[in-house]
Design a protein with these regions (language model features):
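A short acidic/basic microdomain associated with nuclease active sites
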Residues: 1-12
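Active-site donor-binding loop signature of nucleotide-sugar glycosyltransferases
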Residues: 9, 31-33, 90
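A generic beta-sheet turn/junction motif
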Residues: 11-13, 22-24, 81
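Structural motif
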Residues: 13, 26-28, 72, 85
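Conserved catalytic cores of phosphodiester-cleaving nucleases, focusing on short active-site segments
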Residues: 16-38, 54
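Domain-level recognition of nuclease-like catalytic cores that cleave nucleotide substrates
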Residues: 64-95
Length: 95
């Protein structure tokens, strides 16, 4: 089970929708919703630039919360459309 550490975490670098822990892994979770695909698939919104921002924000969080420094990190995405909800674990790797 996940334990929510923070929601809508923000710092001067950026924002992360949800930070949660499960066992020895810290999950930095981006949530993207699209009512329809006119503006693209929700996963497409988590492009390389967005991934970099999430990663840098996660490093800021870890620097502020050193208790989690020994945790593994997973950068996850929840992609929501009218038809489905997809949880993609470790959607992108370390920059």
């Amino acid at each position: 089970n996940f334990k929510i550490i923070a929601s809508n975490y923000s710092c001067k670098i950026g924002e992360i929708d949800v930070i949660a822990s499960k066992e020895d892994t810290l999950h930095f979770i981006e949530i993207k919703y699209r009512k329809n695909l006119m503006y693209g698939n929700p996963l497409e919104a988590v492009n390389y630039r967005k991934q970099q921002k999430i990663y840098k924000t996660a490093m800021w969080f870890l620097n502020e919360n050193q208790i989690f420094m020994d945790f593994q990190c997973s950068f996850d995405v929840i992609a929501i459309t009218e038809e489905q909800i997809r949880y993609i674990y470790n959607c992108f790797g370390v920059m």
